[in-house]
UniProtKB/Swiss-Prot annotation:
Residues modified by glycosylation: 87, 104
GO cellular component: cell surface; plasma membrane
InterPro entries on file: C-type_lectin-like, C-type_lectin-like/link_sf, CTDL_fold, Ly49_N, Mouse_KLRs, NKR-like_CTLD
Name used for this protein in its record: Killer cell lectin-like receptor 8
UniProt GO MF annotations: carbohydrate binding
GO biological process, one term: response to virus
Role summary: Receptor on natural killer (NK) cells for class I MHC.
Recorded topology in the membrane: Single-pass type II membrane protein
SUPFAM superfamilies: C-type lectin-like
Parts of the chain on the Cytoplasmic side: 1-44
Length: 266
């Protein structure tokens, strides 16, 4: 009986130890769960805070980029405005310079304009004198229709058609050679006064020298121009209102005689 009494309390002790262990285990598990719950709350706050910070950074970056582009665009507009003003300034300066040059040119051209007006008046005077002389001309039986003088040179227009040799002979009858044109101005003057016909002039092809030569081997400032015309060496040259050209010397044309004279012949 004494052994049973001893054993029973021992068994109760073991049971109470198991209960205590179970209680402790459950308490420990509860403490861990509570600890996990307590620890999970700060991590959520950290994630939220980081999200807010990232959002703020994105907003700041977006604002910065927007401002940067606005600044770049504004700077570009300013540069364009400055360039436009610079171009306008250059254009205004060029305009002023051209205006000044035109003013100076008009001042420089004033004497030339006065000279041209003087020449025009002289031309009109000569034309009127030429007309009066032409009206007083007479027919001598050799077909002289009219004659006139310009400056110190007089011209005879023989209005019967003949060959170049015949023209030369008719001019010699008046003691005046077939006309030799001195320069471009005289050529234009004669072309302005002839009617719509062709006239022999004192230029023919010298077969011995193989070149074009004026009557009596005279010199003319038209020689270079005649060389550039590339005449076909057909013999003789005639003048019309539009051109001078070579042709067969036996072609019948009117005739122009001309010579520098001190007075009109009787």
């Amino acid at each position: 009986m004494s052994e049973q009494e001893v054993t029973f309390p021992t068994m109760r002790f073991h049971k109470s130890s198991g209960l205590n262990s179970q209680v402790r285990l459950e308490g420990t598990q509860r403490s861990r769960k509570a600890g996990l719950r307590v620890c999970s709350v700060p991590w959520q706050l950290i994630v939220i805070a980081l999200g807010i910070l990232c959002s703020l950074r994105l907003v700041i970056v977006a604002v910065f980029v927007t401002k940067f582009f606005q600044y770049s665009q504004h700077k570009q507009e300013i540069n364009e405005t400055l360039n436009h003003r610079h171009n306008c300034s250059n254009m205004q300066r060029d305009f002023n310079l051209k205006e000044e040059m035109l003013t100076n040119k008009s001042i420089d051209c004033r004497p030339s304009y006065e000279l041209l007006e003087y020449i025009k008046r002289e031309q009109e005077r000569w034309d009127s004198e030429t007309k009066s002389v032409s009206d007083s001309s007479r027919d001598t039986g050799r077909g002289v229709k009219y004659w006139f003088c310009y400056g110190t040179k007089c011209y005879y227009f023989i209005m019967n058609k003949t060959t170049w040799s015949g023209c030369k002979a008719n001019c010699q009858h008046y003691s005046v050679p077939i006309v030799k044109i001195e320069d471009e101005d005289e050529l234009k003057f004669l072309q302005r006064h002839v009617i719509l016909e062709s006239y022999w002039i004192g230029l023919s092809y010298d077969k011995k020298k193989k070149e074009w030569a004026w009557i009596h081997n005279g010199q003319s400032k038209l020689d270079m121009k005649i060389k550039k015309m590339n005449f076909t060496s057909r013999g003789c040259v005639f003048l019309s209102k539009a051109r001078i050209e070579d042709t067969d010397c036996n072609t019948p044309y009117y005739c122009i005689c001309g010579k520098k004279l001190d007075k009109f012949p009787d």
